[in-house]
Curated annotation (Swiss-Prot):
Residues 39-49, 66-95, 334-348, 432-459, 773-783, 968-977 have a biased composition (Polar residues). It comes from Mus musculus (Mouse). Residues 103-120, 460-482, 608-623, 633-664 have a biased composition (Basic and acidic residues). There is a cross-link at K189, K307, K316, K418, K462, K480, K497, K601, K652, K796, K816, K962 (Glycyl lysine isopeptide (Lys-Gly) (interchain with G-Cter in SUMO2)). One of its GO terms (molecular function) is DNA binding. This is Teashirt homolog 2. Residues 11-42 form a coiled coil. Sumoylated. GO terms for biological process: regulation of gene expression. Probable transcriptional regulator involved in developmental processes. May act as a transcriptional repressor (Potential).
Length: 1030
């Protein structure tokens, strides 16, 4: 608002009447004391009538002054400049007074030009001189009521009103000093209209008005102060700080409110309450301040979800039972992927427990996640596969390891470079779970193959895309049905608590729900095909497809009908999916055969249980019934297939079946699963993806040669297939010694990387190793070790697992695939540093880590104080490491950056501690030795490596050329004329010089070089050639 030009202060007109007032003062002094109390009420009532009525009747009618011309009016005008302006009525009154009193004031001022200069004037004289000022309602609170005649009041009125545009500074200063010096009498409560609100009107009506110096005025008592501090002190002392905005609807005129309103005054209350609502509890508030206080007191701001909030459920409206159901089903975990329980209590119960998916929390912030973890711990500790809840993290870990449900978890962990650490207690618990007491006989298995459950499991498995998912869900249903149907047998049946997929489950599937095994077959086949093509969907560890490449391990065992699985190594010419060798023959239906293959753990049961099982038609009879026509074919095909095993243990397992003649068998018509006998003729070989997967896992983890520590009890099973050997139902097996087994069991045992009791059912291994024990007729043997590796072992042992070096085969295999693979294994130890893709640090080659650690230690420099400081490896050192190890420059740089980050943040890393103190301690990752200086540490690492770091440059060039020559030799030997001819028919344009594989685009070759040969992008052009050039 533009400020008007200030005029020079005029002399107060009151000084001219000093003598007159002295005379009148003595006369009226008595009257003032008598009418003192009455004048206070009169001056207070003047506020009601002196504003609008004076405009019509003039100032003489009632004899009271207008409020607008007193010092209080100046203050109110100043207040109006800050908040609102004067009313029209007050402006017109001041105009009338200023017109009538201008000449009189000039005349009086000229007649008495002398100013009162005596500072010792008494207080009575000053009160008489300025009675006109003090008669206003501004001073009514002080009780200074003076009764003046109408003429004197008119003169005072004209003298005081020097115009709307002038401000009497001197008079204002005197009134201020008078306010400070006058003793305050009893202050009566001001009337309703004594506050400034009476004079406030809209600024649009009267425009801008400047009234003088800045003042701070109390609304209730109209006291003015120079500073805000004084006004604040006054308000605190008198309690005048109550906000009267809440009374505005009742007390204020209905014209307009002040311009600066609160943000929500223009809104309806309903609209404000819709906006001002706590997102957690749903309470509404009238003002933002109330909402803020509520949020701070209740700490609901920590619990507001970032996504759509949960619909508030009143505790009064929801019964405790429904609230418990709501808590059970609410997915509080940020990683929760489903809002329903997958635990199948019963179809009706699970249907009632479902909640709408829109009640999810979504991803939370940290505070919200902490709160929800405490509130819904059992829901956060939930299996992401089957939805089962657990009270502690250890229980969840045990459940996920036993069921194999943690593939998704390990998938995300492997992407972050983390290794799943298994609790030793949980591992022991799993081991104890997998073993059954010798003297304990299994209770009769509850019927879990009801149509409803079979249907449910079938539909569940169709939704799942992974083998382990199907196992876990089938097992969950089996366990739950046992809990509900046979609660009395729960303490008697030790397998109820087991989370493995047991033979009973597969037995039910083979009778009623064959889709289970069909689904397993399809998923395993898909997984192997994807792994062969380098795009695995099964991501339990960073590079699972390396497990399928058969680079250093054994070959897959003979499957049903002597089927050969064409899994080529990674450097092979063309990677082909699994397909039957004889293309003209159709595949036999697999589900039944797979179910028969899994009947393994039955041999761990007592003979009483065996008799019970024999009393009814069971898949054991099915196995024996259809194994007869296959016996001859396998005995013919087996000799060449035996030599395909590079390791001795599988040789023994496969050679035994052909040397033993099966006992008389039941007719084929005893099959109870409805499969035709023709499906099992030797002319129809079938794929067994589970056997292929088993061989792959055994190859990768070294578990294929695990010995059976004790003989199994005589079993009523007999099958002459190469992977399962079972005798007749009613005749005890005879010990059989295989003539081709050239090594004793003791020599086999040293091929084991580890022995674990935590293995589910065996899908491939033979159970006829009774020849290696003297207790062949024992029926109370402990359970056998099964080789379908528990996924927990895979995660735990994979970084340390090294496949045993294969023994030379005694026979020449007929298939070219095995010849190529054996040739490749001859140089696999040297090629391993190049052809294996490097993963995260958990899967690094230990030799590469030693080299990197030694180089990093050599880069540290020592200061004059004896402290060691970080330095950086130069490009030359990094290039030497890259050439020697085959690691890319990017990988080396990332490793160095990670080590530096850990040292700066925590002061230490795995091989280097106390770096922040300047006196590092070096740790050898191989032997855990400690060293104080980099030189001794480097020399120690060189002793592990077998060479000195300074010789690494020379060795790098030699090794590079040697390895590339070997790779080229092996790869060229692997190429057969048919594959080369088939390759030339395609649109391949580029070729890898190292392995002679061809690709459609140059980009594909570069990806191949990076992934297969670990070549950095800087060297890609050296190893790419056009097919047309040759």
């Amino acid at each position: 608002m533009p400020r008007r030009k200030q005029q020079a202060p005029k002399r107060a007109a009151g000084y001219a009447q000093e003598e007159v007032l002295k005379e009148e003062e003595e006369i009226k002094e008595e009257e003032e004391e008598e009418e003192d109390s009455g004048s206070v009420a009169q001056h207070q009532s003047s506020n009601d009538t002196g504003t609008d009525e004076e405009l019509e009747t003039g100032p003489e009618q009632k004899g009271y002054f207008s409020c607008q011309n007193s010092p209080g009016s100046h203050l109110s005008n100043q207040d109006a400049e800050n908040e609102s302006l004067l009313s029209d009525a007050s402006d017109q009154v001041s105009d009338v007074k200023s017109v009538c009193g201008r000449d009189v004031s000039d005349k009086k001022a000229n007649t008495h030009p002398k100013l009162p200069s005596e500072p010792h004037n008494c207080m009575d004289k000053m009160t008489a001189v300025y009675a006109n000022i003090l008669s206003d309602s501004y001073w009514s609170g002080l009780g200074l009521g003076f009764k003046l005649s109408n003429s004197e009041r008119r003169n005072c009125d004209t003298r005081n009103s020097s115009g709307k545009n002038d401000f009497d500074w001197h008079q204002d200063a005197l009134s201020k000093s008078l306010q400070q010096n006058l003793p305050s009498r009893s202050v009566s409560k001001p009337s309703l209209f004594s506050s400034v609100q009476l004079y406030r009107q809209s600024s649009k009506l009267c425009g801008s008005v400047f009234t003088g110096a800045s003042r701070f005025r109390c609304r209730q008592c109209s006291a003015a102060y120079d500073t805000l501090v004084e006004l604040t002190v006054h308000m605190n002392e008198t309690g005048h700080y109550q906000d009267d905005n809440r009374k505005k609807d009742k007390l204020r005129p209905t014209s307009y409110s002040k311009p600066r309103k609160r943000a929500f005054q223009d809104m309806d209350k309903e609209d404000a309450q819709k906006v001002l609502k706590c997102m957690f509890c749903g309470d509404s508030f009238d003002s933002l301040q109330d909402l803020s206080v509520h949020m701070i007191k209740t700490k609901h701001y920590q619990k507001v979800p970032l996504k759509e909030p949960v619909p508030t459920i009143s505790s009064k409206m929801v019964t405790p039972a429904k609230k418990r159901v709501f808590d059970v089903n609410r997915p509080c975990s940020p990683d929760s992927t489903t809002g329903s329980l997958a635990d199948s209590f019963s179809s009706q119960k699970s249907a009632n427990l479902q909640l709408p998916s829109n009640s999810r929390y979504g991803y939370q912030n940290g505070a919200s996640y902490t709160w929800q973890f405490e509130a819904c711990k059992s829901q956060i500790l939930k299996c992401m596969e089957c939805g089962s809840s657990h009270d502690t993290l250890q229980q969840l870990t045990t459940h996920m390891m036993v069921t194999g449900h943690f593939l998704k978890v390990t998938s995300s962990a492997s992407k972050k470079g983390k290794q799943l650490v298994l609790d030793p207690l949980a591992v022991e618990k799993m081991q104890s779970l997998s073993e059954t007491p010798n003297s304990e006989s299994l209770a009769p298995k509850p019927s879990s193959n009801s149509p409803s459950e079979c249907t449910a499991s079938t539909t569940e498995l169709k939704k799942e895309s992974k083998k382990e998912k199907g196992e876990g869900i089938e097992d969950e249903q089996g366990v739950k049905s046992e809990d509900y149907e046979d609660s009395l047998q729960k303490p008697l049946d030790p397998t109820i608590k087991y989370q493995y997929l047991r033979e009973e489950d597969l037995e039910d599937g083979s009778k009623g729900g064959g889709d289970i095994l069909k689904s397993l077959e399809n998923t395993v086949t898909t997984a192997i095909n994807k792994a062969q093509n380098g795009a695995p969907s099964w991501s339990a560890y960073p590079s699972i497809h390396a497990a399928y490449q058969l680079s250093e391990g054994t070959k897959p065992p003979m499957a049903m009908g002597s089927q050969i699985l064409q899994i080529r190594p990674n450097l092979a010419n063309k990677l082909r999916p699994i397909a039957p060798k004889w293309k003209g023959m159709p595949l036999g239906p697999v589900p039944t055969s797979l179910a028969l293959y899994t009947q393994v753990k039955k041999e761990t049961e007592d003979k009483d249980e065996v008799v019970k099982q024999c009393g009814k038609e069971s898949p054991h009879e099915e196995a024996t019934s259809f194994s007869q026509p296959e016996g001859e074919s396998f005995s013919k095909i087996e000799p060449p297939s035996e030599s395909r095993k590079a390791e001795p243990c599988p040789l023994k397992e496969e050679e035994k079946p052909q040397k033993e003649k099966p006992e008389p068998l039941e007719p084929v018509s005893s099959l109870t699963n409805g499969c035709a006998p023709a499906n099992h003729t030797p002319a129809l070989p079938s794929i067994n993806p589970l056997s292929a997967l088993q061989s792959v896992l055994n190859n990768h983890l070294g578990k294929a040669t695990e010995p059976l520590r004790s003989p199994s009890c005589s079993s009523p099973n007999s099958s002459t297939s190469p992977v399962f050997h079972k005798s007749s139902l009613h005749v005890v097996d005879k010990p059989v010694i295989s003539p081709t087994s050239t090594r004793p069991a003791a020599s086999v045992a040293r091929h084991y990387l580890f022995e674990n009791t935590d293995q589910p059912i065996d899908l491939t291994k033979s159970k006829s190793k009774r020849a290696e024990s003297s207790q062949a007729q024992s029926c109370t043997s402990p359970p056998q070790k099964h080789a379908l590796c528990d996924i927990a072992d895979m995660v735990k042992v994979l970084p340390k697992a090294t496949t045993p070096k294969p023994a030379a085969s005694s026979r020449v295999p007929p298939m070219k695939l095995e010849i190529d693979v054996r040739r490749f294994e001859d140089v696999s130890s040297e090629v391993s540093t190049l052809h294996k893709r490097k993963g995260r640090q958990s899967n690094w080659n230990p030799q590469h880590l030693l080299i990197l650690q030694a180089q990093f230690a050599s880069s540290l420099f020592q200061t004059s104080e004896g402290k060691y400081l970080l330095s950086d490896l130069g490009p030359q050192e990094r290039m030497q490491i890259s050439k020697f190890t085959g690691l890319s420059m990017t990988t080396i740089s990332h490793w160095l950056a990670n080590v530096k980050y850990q040292l700066r943040k925590t002061g230490g890393t795995k091989f280097l501690k106390n770096m922040d103190k300047g006196h590092p301690i070096f740790y050898c990752s191989d032997c855990a030795s400690q060293f104080r200086t980099p030189s001794t540490y480097i020399s120690h690492l060189e002793s592990h490596l077998g060479f000195q770091m300074k010789d690494m440059t020379r060795m790098a060039a030699d090794q590079q050329s040697k390895v590339e020559q070997e790779i080229s030799r092996v790869s060229s030997a692997q190429r057969s004329p048919e594959t080369i001819a088939g390759e030339e028919d395609t649109d391949s344009k580029f070729k890898c010089k190292l392995c002679r594989r061809t690709f459609v685009s140059k980009h594909a070759v570069k990806l191949h070089l990076s992934k297969t040969h670990s070549k950095s992008p800087e060297h890609h052009s050296q190893f790419v050639a056009d097919v047309d050039e040759e």
